[in-house]
């Protein structure tokens, strides 16, 4: 097995001894969250979403493109507002069911 310089520092190992440990720890924390698996807002599948541009994300499974955070698909503020949006969607579905009858 080849020797790995990134066993402890993770993705920040590509910087070697440069930039200081504090910055490299922050980079590691951001990149681990960014490249991890996230839930698609459309198909609800748990996949590695593709970051197309700064804040633009795409689901590889269903092809859904959406705006999210710069480094993560969903921001902290977006998570806080999500329950309210779900209530509105459920209310709309209920209204549609009533009109369909």
UniProtKB/Swiss-Prot annotation:
GO biological process assignments: translation
SUPFAM superfamilies with a match to the protein in the record: Zn-binding ribosomal proteins
Cofactor(s) named in the record: Zn(2+)
Zinc fingers (C4-type) by residue: 40-62
Top-level taxonomic group: Archaea
GO cellular component terms listed in the entry, alphabetical order: ribonucleoprotein complex; ribosome
Keywords of this entry: Metal-binding, Ribonucleoprotein, Ribosomal protein, RNA-binding, Zinc, Zinc-finger
Note on how the cofactor is bound: Binds 1 zinc ion per subunit.
Record Gene3D superfamilies: 2.20.25.30
InterPro entries assigned to the protein according to its UniProt record, in alphabetical order: Ribosomal_eL37/eL43, Ribosomal_eL43, Ribosomal_protein_eL43, Ribosomal_zn-bd
Regions crossing the membrane: none
Pfam hit, one: Ribosomal_L37ae
Molecular functions per Gene Ontology: large ribosomal subunit rRNA binding; structural constituent of ribosome; zinc ion binding
Family (UniProt): Belongs to the eukaryotic ribosomal protein eL43 family.
NCBIfam families membership: PRK03976.1
Protein name, as recorded: Large ribosomal subunit protein eL43
Source species: Pyrobaculum neutrophilum (strain DSM 2338 / JCM 9278 / NBRC 100436 / V24Sta) (Thermoproteus neutrophilus)
Lineage: Archaea, Thermoproteota, Thermoprotei, Thermoproteales, Thermoproteaceae
């Amino acid at each position: 097995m080849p020797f790995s310089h990134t066993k402890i520092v993770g993705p920040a190992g590509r910087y070697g001894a440069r930039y200081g440990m504090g910055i490299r720890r922050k980079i590691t924390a951001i990149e681990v969250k960014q490249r991890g698996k996230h839930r698609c807002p459309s198909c609800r599948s748990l996949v590695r979403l593709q970051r197309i541009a700064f804040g633009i994300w795409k689901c590889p499974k269903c092809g859904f493109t959406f705006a999210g955070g710069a480094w993560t698909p969903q921001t902290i503020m977006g998570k806080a507002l999500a329950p309210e949006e779900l209530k509105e969607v459920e209310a709309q579905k209920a209204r549609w069911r009533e009109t369909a009858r």
